[in-house]
Amino acid sequence: MPRASVDRIIRKAGAERVSDKASSALALALEEIGLEIARISRELSEHANRKTITDKDVRLGYSQWKRSRV
């Protein structure tokens, strides 16, 4: 994920300045979260006998991931 995108996310959260290490740490966390949501989405598409992951799979995968974290 581009550093500028990660910096922008952190700044949207209210930070005025962002260290390189903070950007790297958030980028790693976002990648791990994205991989988990993608895995769930793949399982949903396979359950529906499809090889293509759709936007609905991703939205449902995110919803399931979010519920599992509560």
Q: How should these model regions be labeled?
A:
Residues 1-70:
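Terminal helix-to-tail segments of small alpha-helical proteins
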